[in-house]
Curated annotation (Swiss-Prot):
Function according to Swiss-Prot or TrEMBL: Catalyzes the transfer of endogenously produced octanoic acid from octanoyl-acyl-carrier-protein onto the lipoyl domains of lipoate-dependent enzymes. Lipoyl-ACP can also act as a substrate although octanoyl-ACP is likely to be the physiological substrate.
Classification of source organism: Bacteria, Pseudomonadati, Thermodesulfobacteriota, Desulfovibrionia, Desulfovibrionales
HAMAP family with a match to the protein in the record: LipB
EC number, UniProt record: 2.3.1.181
Protein name as it appears in the record: Octanoyltransferase
Active site per database record: 171
Pathway noted in the entry: Protein modification; protein lipoylation via endogenous pathway; protein N(6)-(lipoyl)lysine from octanoyl-[acyl-carrier-protein]: step 1/2
Length: 214
C-alpha cells in the first residue's frame, strides 16, 4: 500500500488520478494506493442522484465558488471544501474476507479511531451510512468498485467552517446536519494532523504491514 498526499486538488483531477491508478492496479503494474487530499469547494452527486437535494440554484452555488459534479460513487449528495480531509483508497478487495461490506465497515472504523485520537467519541448510526457524533455527521462514505478494486471513498469534516453544507440536504437525509472534528473537540485542528493520524489508523485496521510512502 502506497500512501500519497495530493494536497489541495480539483475534484476532476483527483478522479483522473484515481482512474489511472485503478487501471494500473487492475493490470498489476502498480500497488494499492491511499490518496489523502482536500478539494476546492464542490458539490458531488452519487449514484443515487441528489440534485433534488440541492437547496440553491447552480448559479447561486457558482457565486459561492463551487460547482455540481456527478460521480460514480455510491450515495447521494454531499460537498467538499478546504478544511475537509478526503480519502480515496484504490485497492483490491477480492481476497479480503467480507468483501465490500467489510471494506465499508473498516473505512468507518478507521474514521472512528481517528476521531478518538483527538478525544472525540464517534460512532456508526444504524440505517445511516457514515460516522456520527450524536446527531451530527462527521464523515460521509461513498465508494465505487470496478473488478473488485475500490475508488472514491470517504470525506471527514475537520474545520469548523462548514458553510457549504447550507446549500444541500446532507446525503438526502432530512434533519441530518454536519459536524466537524474541530467543533466537537472545541479547538481548531488542521487537516495535516488528521491525515497523519488517519494514515496510522488505516494501517492498523487494514493491515499490520502498511508503511507510509512520500
Amino acid at each position: 500500500m502506497e500512501f500519497i498526499d495530493l494536497g489541495l486538488i480539483p475534484h476532476g483531477e483527483a478522479e483522473r488520478i484515481q482512474l489511472e491508478r485503478l487501471k494500473q492496479v487492475m493490470e498489476g503494474t502498480a500497488e494499492d494506493a491511499l490518496y489523502l487530499l482536500e478539494h476546492p469547494p464542490v458539490v458531488t452527486l452519487g449514484r443515487q442522484g441528489g440534485l433534488e437535494n440541492l437547496l440553491i440554484s447552480e448559479e447561486a452555488l457558482k457565486a459561492m465558488g463551487a460547482e455540481v459534479v456527478q460521480t460514480a460513487r455510491g450515495g447521494n449528495i454531499t460537498c467538499h471544501y478546504p478544511g475537509q480531509m478526503v480519502v480515496y483508497p484504490v485497492m483490491r478487495i477480492e481476497k479480503r474476507r467480507g468483501g465490500i461490506k467489510k471494506f465499508f465497515f473498516d473505512m468507518e472504523e478507521t474514521a472512528i479511531r481517528t476521531a478518538a485520537r483527538f478525544g472525540v467519541q464517534a460512532a456508526r448510526s444504524e440505517g445511516r451510512p457514515g460516522v456520527w457524533v450524536g446527531p451530527g455527521k462527521l464523515c460521509s462514505i461513498g465508494i465505487g468498485v470496478k473488478k473488485w478494486i475500490t475508488y472514491h471513498g470517504l470525506s471527514f469534516n475537520v474545520s469548523s467552517d462548514m458553510k457549504l453544507f447550507d446549500a444541500i440536504t446532507l446525503c438526502g437525509l432530512h434533519g441530518a446536519h454536519p459536524t466537524s472534528l474541530s467543533r466537537e473537540a472545541g479547538k481548531e485542528i488542521s487537516t495535516e494532523e488528521v491525515k497523519n493520524v488517519f494514515r496510522e489508523e488505516f494501517g492498523k485496521v487494514f493491515t499490520d504491514t502498511a508503511v507510509a510512502a512520500s
